[in-house]
C-alpha cells in the first residue's frame, strides 16, 4: 500500500476587531449542498457493492485476475417513479491508450497502457466517465540548505488540504427536561477513506459508544468506548475505517451527526453535526465551554485559538449552542478572558440567533499573558445580557489530541548533512499545564555527544535559535526531562511542526543529527502510548552502513500472537537520482540477528512515503522465539542497500506456542471483543455493555465467537446484540471415496490429506502453511475447504472457501445454484443453499444433463459439460473467450491456469501473440500477420 506523506494546510480567517462598540459578525459555516437522496443506491458486481459514479477494474478471481484494460462504471439511473438506481457498464480502455513516444515501450505491472522506461504512466482519459476520487499528494522537493525535512504551508495548495472536520456536541434543545449539561468537542481527520477522530468531553460519564448517523437518524457506524481506549482520561480515540463513497459525500456536505451514547440511555445524550472549519489547521489552544449554572442544560460552546505568525495576537473562533435572546435575531454577548477570577480582556459583540459562531482577535498579549496561556491559567467566558442572562465558561488549554508527537533525527536532515549511520529517536508529551516532557534515544554517533538542543528553523546558516538546552539531561545515550517554562509562542510552534531537535558531537559541532518534531496520526496501535520506539540505524546493520537515513518503530504482540508494527523513517530516497528524491522506497523486514541463517527473514511491507504500518498474523515459531529472546531485528531495505539500510533490535517477551490461533475444543479463540490493534475488552466494561450476551454462565462480548460447552467440537456460537446464535459446523463435500475422521476435527478429510497433515504437523509452525480467515477470525490449515462463518450473518452455506497454503490466501467462491424448470422448487433442508425440484418433477433438460454427466470424471463449467481430460479456453461474459487461460477437466475437477510468459532478450525485434511477447521470425509470412490483425477482438488482453 502506498503511503505518501500528506501535508494539510488551512488558513485562519479573522475579522478585524474594534472593542469600543458591539459588532455583528458573519456566521462561520461551510457551504452546504442539498441532500438529493436518503436511500443509498449503487451497483452490485462480482459480489461487491459500488456507489453511484464509482469506477473500478473488474476482478474475475483466480486464475483470471484483475482486468486492468477494462474499466467498469456504476452509471446513475432513475426509475419511472424517480427512485435512483445504478447500472454497470464496462468499457475496453486499451484503445484509449496514448501512443508512446519511444521506440521500446514497456508494460508496467498493474497497468493497461505501455509507457516509456522511466516515464510516469499516462493518465486514463476521463471523457466518458466522471471521477470524484481522493487526492494523493506528493512531497515537494525542498532543497533548503538549513532544514531539508522542513514542511510548510507553501508545499500544499489550500484546496488540497480540506480534510479536517469538527463537531460541537451538546444536549438536544427539543428534549425536555434535558438529560445532561455535558459538552464535547470532536475533531476529525480524513485520511483517504479512513476517518480518524478524537473526542474530548466534560460533564458526562458512563459512555458506551460513539454513534455516527445521517440527518434522518439512520445509524451509519458505531464505535465502542473502552476504558483502556485512549491516552487521556477525558478523550476518546478511534477510527472509522473504509468509508464508502456515499458516506464520504454525506461527510463533505455536513450531513453526518456524531453522538455520545451512555450505558444508562439507549438514545444519544449529546450530539452535533460534523462540519469543515478553517480554524482547525492552525488551532493550537482550545476550550470547552459549559454552563456555569448546573440547572442550565442543553447549551455549550467551543473555542479554537491560535497565535499570529509574528505578533503576539490571539485569534479565536467561538462555536456556541443554546444561547437565546429576548427579541429579534441578534443576541448581545460579553466575552471575557480571566486569570484567577480577574478579568484581563473583554469585548462586546452581537451574534445571530440562528448561527451562534463568530471570530475575534485579542491584540498584543503581554509576556505574562503568553505564559498564563501556555500553562492553562486563562479562562474564557461568554455571557448574555437581559432579564434572564446565560453564561458559560471553560479553561483554555493546549489542544488535546490522540496523535503522537515524535521525531526521527538523522544525519541527512542535519544543517550540514552527514552520513554516519547514527540515529536519534524522540517522543514528546505535552501536558495540560504546558509542561513539555521529552524522551530521546541517541545511538551510533561517530564521537561523543556534546549538546542536545530544541531549536527553531534558523534564519541563516550560521545563526541557530536555541529555545531549550537539554544537554544536562543526557546520560548514556538517553535524554529524559521536562521543560516547564515554555510560553504560548513556543507551544504554538511545537504544535505547528516548527521546532527541531539537534544533536551535536565532538566531530560535528553544528550537529550530526537533526529532526523535525511532527505529529504522528492516531493509528490504534496501543504500543505508542506504552513504550518508547525502537531506534533504526545504519550502524545496527551487519556490516554497518554509513547512511544519512534513520528511523524508529513501535512493535508489539497481542494475546493472539499477531504482530503489529508502525515504522517512521527519514532521509531515505535522498539519492542522486532526482526521480527517487521525493519519496522513500523501502521494504520493511523482520528477521533474526544471527548470521547462521541469513535467509530467514519475513517481508512485512514494501512502501512509499515516510511511514509504514500493518500487522502479521502468521509468524512462525522460530521468529516468535527470537522476539522472545531479543535476538530479532526489524529493518528497512532499499534499492541502494538491499540487505538493509537501517535496522533495530527488538525484544518482545512472549509465550506463543504456535504461529496462529485455531478454534479447538481446548482453546476458544476470542474471549473478548478486540479493540483496534488487539487489546482485550475489559471485563468490567462487559458487565456494563448492553449488547453483551450471557450464555452458559459466562458473559460474551458483542461480536465475539466461541465453541459452546455442550458441543465444543462441531458447533460455534456468536453474540450479536444480546442474542446468542449457535450453528452446527457444516462440512463441505469431499472429492474422495473414503473420507476419514480425525480425533481433533469435526469434519472428515480425505485419506491423502490426513497423511499430509500428519507429516506436516510438526513443521506447521515453521512453514506457516495456513491461512487466517478474517471473516470468523480463525486459523485454517493449508488445503482446508469450509463454509465461512461471517458474523453477524452466521454460517454462509452459499459459499465455499479454500486455504491456499503456498500463499496463505483465502479464496472464497459463491455456490452456483442450477437453473430449475419446475414451477415449485423446494429446499430439501432449511439450511440448504440451493433449491431443487421435487423428484417427481425433474425436467427433460435435467435428465439430459444427468446423462451427460454419467461419463467417468466429466466436469461442468458454466452451462457446458466437458469429458475427462478435455482442454478448453473458458468464456467469461462480457469479455469473451479468455485465450490466455486454459482449463482442464481432471477426474471431475476443473483446473484453470493462466499461460506463463518467459522474458525475451531479442530487443526491439519482438512481437506479441495472444498472451506473451516472442522474438520475431524473420521468415514470418505476411499473410499470417494480416490474419492475426483481422481476428483480434476488442476484448483481447
From Swiss-Prot:
Keywords: Developmental protein, Glycoprotein, Repeat, Secreted, Signal
Name of one Pfam family that matches: VWC
GO cellular component, one term: extracellular space
Residues in the signal sequence: 1-19
Inducers of expression: By activin in the presence of de novo protein synthesis, and by gsc and not2.
SMART domains, per the entry: CHRD, VWC
Protein name in UniProt: Chordin
Organism listed in the record: Xenopus laevis
Higher taxonomy: Eukaryota, Metazoa, Chordata, Craniata, Vertebrata
Gene assigned in the entry: chrd
